[in-house]
């Protein structure tokens, strides 16, 4: 029988402190009962001897030092999962908010996940088709990969996320279907409604599991959202043998919540005030992508983050780049030119692309046309720099041809619109058509 503790030593923001507590575990769930009989949930976030610090999910309003009762539940936070989670909408802590009732759980899964034995991992191969030429051809998303999107303020990363959810599909019939887990952190009501409305209008909601943490929801819930989403993905992938694509936005909001949470605990800050363990915390999310031996399913991740002031050296994109396998970078200049999606292909990279394309996966000429497009577009940038110095009239005929190629590439290859869903064959054929204008 669990012990119940009466009274609190201290209340500090969303944290409460208890003393003389025996046998508490880090991340253990706590039930907090108010004087009026209502209950709230929390978890242990710090232990010093017999003193523990508990983060209260619903906040500490109306809690009193004398009359609050606290009970340690002896388990970490768990997510109820079953096949019924498909098509459902949850809040950031995994509670249903779509009015369709509770989930009848087949099992309860620890949201922190199970550590994957590195030896049991299978090397990611085969690709996920997004229907977006700049990604499918030049920064191909490989099944089991973690490939972030680096965006900036005012760029259409939300539209791009919706388009990927609408169009993404696996290239073969292995596994028992394809599902998408979508997690939004720190978004406004308008953006959350846009996501829900877009998925329903596109008719893809039955294959989507949504987790929505709004900007006015508790900070602690924001730190739980990606873990709940990844737990749902692992259940679908490893228990239901489905291929799962996890898209979560915005990782920067998550990291800012982590910074605020760390500050409230009085921890020593690191770069730009973020906690010193930011790297390992992000790794605990990103490294849950992959394929394991004996399972037909897979977990693929597309974390979306906004770079403050478009600074790629900011701690969040910087550390994300160390952990993940490439990045897709969005360009403010292309966006200003009316090009959608504004993917800047030169700094974009998929490190696993070489092993999931070509004969038997996409098409035998995929790597060749990708190399050609990269080389030609890189030369276009050199010619543009030269043009700014000597003017277009002084360029050689060959350089003028490269400028023409650059305009065609941006207007017809990169720019494809929100509703265009190109197959890999259409994308590769279009690439060959474009390079044919060059000698």
Feature roles, as predicted:
Residues 155-206:
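Conserved P-loop
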Residues 1-4, 10-130:
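Acidic-enriched and Gly/Ser
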Residues 151-152:
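The Walker A (P-loop) glycine that initiates the GxxxxGKT/S ATP-binding motif of P-loop NTPases
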Residues 140-142, 168-176, 200-205, 235-240, ...:
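Conserved catalytic network of the ASCE P-loop NTPase/AAA+ motor domain
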Residues 253, 260-439:
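Conserved catalytic/coupling modules of large nucleotide/cofactor-utilizing molecular machines
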């Amino acid at each position: 029988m669990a012990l119940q503790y009466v009274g609190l030593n201290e209340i500090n923001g969303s944290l409460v402190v208890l003393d003389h507590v025996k046998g508490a575990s880090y991340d253990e769930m706590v039930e907090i009962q108010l004087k009026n009989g209502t209950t709230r949930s929390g978890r242990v976030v710090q232990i010093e001897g017999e003193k523990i610090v508990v983060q209260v999910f619903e906040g500490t309003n109306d809690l009193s030092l004398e009359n609050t009762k606290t009970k340690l539940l002896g388990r970490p936070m768990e997510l109820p999962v079953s096949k019924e989670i498909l098509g459902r909408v949850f809040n950031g802590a995994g509670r249903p908010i779509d009015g369709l009732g509770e989930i009848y759980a087949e099992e309860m899964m620890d949201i922190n996940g199970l550590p994957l034995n590195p030896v049991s991992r299978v090397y990611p191969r085969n690709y996920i088709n997004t229907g977006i030429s700049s990604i499918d051809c030049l920064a191909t998303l490989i099944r089991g990969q973690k490939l972030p999107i680096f965006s900036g303020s005012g760029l259409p990363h939300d539209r791009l996320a919706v388009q990927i959810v609408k169009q993404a599909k696996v290239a073969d019939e292995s596994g028992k279907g394809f599902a998408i887990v979508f997690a939004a952190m720190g978004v406004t009501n308008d953006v959350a409604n846009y996501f829900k409305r877009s998925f329903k209008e596109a008719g893809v909601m039955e294959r989507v599991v949504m987790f929505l943490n709004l900007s006015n929801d508790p900070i602690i819930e924001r730190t739980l959202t990606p873990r709940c989403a990844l737990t749902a993905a692992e259940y679908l992938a490893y228990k239901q043998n489905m291929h799962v694509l996890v898209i979560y936005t915005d990782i920067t909001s998550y990291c800012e919540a982590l910074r605020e949470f760390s500050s409230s605990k009085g921890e020593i800050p690191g770069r730009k005030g973020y906690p010193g363990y930011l790297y390992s915390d992000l790794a605990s999310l990103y490294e849950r992508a992959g394929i394991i031996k004996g399972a037909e399913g897979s977990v693929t991740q597309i974390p979306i983050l906004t770079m403050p002031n478009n600074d790629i050296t900011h701690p969040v994109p910087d550390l994300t780049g160390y952990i993940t396998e490439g990045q897709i970078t969005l360009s403010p200049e292309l966006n200003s030119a009316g090009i959608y999606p504004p993917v800047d292909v030169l700094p974009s990279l998929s490190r696993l692309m070489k092993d999931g394309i070509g004969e038997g996966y996409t098409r035998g000429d995929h790597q060749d046309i990708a190399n050609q497009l990269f080389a030609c577009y890189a030369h276009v940038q050199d010619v543009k720099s030269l043009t700014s110095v000597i003017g277009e009239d002084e360029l050689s005929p060959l350089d003028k041809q490269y400028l023409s190629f650059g305009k065609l590439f941006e207007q017809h290859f990169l720019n494809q619109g929100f509703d265009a869903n190109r197959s890999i064959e259409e994308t590769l054929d279009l690439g060959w058509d474009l390079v044919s204008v060059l000698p």
